[in-house]
Amino acid sequence: MKLTCMMIVAVLFLTAWTVVTAEPHSSNVLENLYLKAHHEMENPEASKLNTRDRCQRANFVCDAFHHAAVCCEGVCVLVCA
């Protein structure tokens, strides 16, 4: 019985904590994301999604620090293939 009461109190406390610490104006967060995306559509250079300029050519030597993310095509197995 005591364990059940403690569990109920813990759940109520965590629920209250979530409500108290919640973002008060969460709609503004979505609005800001929309405005940022709209700006990136008007100015493609501002977009962080255009990462093709950081791609490495084929036969680029890649190691533990330069992994498959830097190869434009294929995979990294000691060199970009």
Curated annotation (Swiss-Prot):
<feature type="propeptide">
    <location>
        <begin position="23"/>
        <end position="53"/>
    </location>
</feature>
<dbReference type="GO" id="GO:0008200">
    <property type="term" value="F:ion channel inhibitor activity"/>
</dbReference>
<keyword id="KW-0800">Toxin</keyword>
<feature type="disulfide bond">
    <location>
        <begin position="62"/>
        <end position="76"/>
    </location>
</feature>
<protein>
    <recommendedName>
        <fullName>Conotoxin A11GB</fullName>
    </recommendedName>
</protein>
<dbReference type="Pfam" id="PF02950">
    <property type="entry name" value="Conotoxin"/>
</dbReference>
<keyword id="KW-0964">Secreted</keyword>
<keyword id="KW-1015">Disulfide bond</keyword>
<comment type="similarity">
    <text>Belongs to the conotoxin O1 superfamily.</text>
</comment>
<feature type="disulfide bond">
    <location>
        <begin position="71"/>
        <end position="80"/>
    </location>
</feature>
<keyword id="KW-0960">Knottin</keyword>
<keyword id="KW-0732">Signal</keyword>
<feature type="disulfide bond">
    <location>
        <begin position="55"/>
        <end position="72"/>
    </location>
</feature>
<keyword id="KW-0528">Neurotoxin</keyword>
<dbReference type="InterPro" id="IPR004214">
    <property type="entry name" value="Conotoxin"/>
</dbReference>
<feature type="signal peptide">
    <location>
        <begin position="1"/>
        <end position="22"/>
    </location>
</feature>
<dbReference type="GO" id="GO:0005576">
    <property type="term" value="C:extracellular region"/>
</dbReference>
<dbReference type="GO" id="GO:0090729">
    <property type="term" value="F:toxin activity"/>
</dbReference>
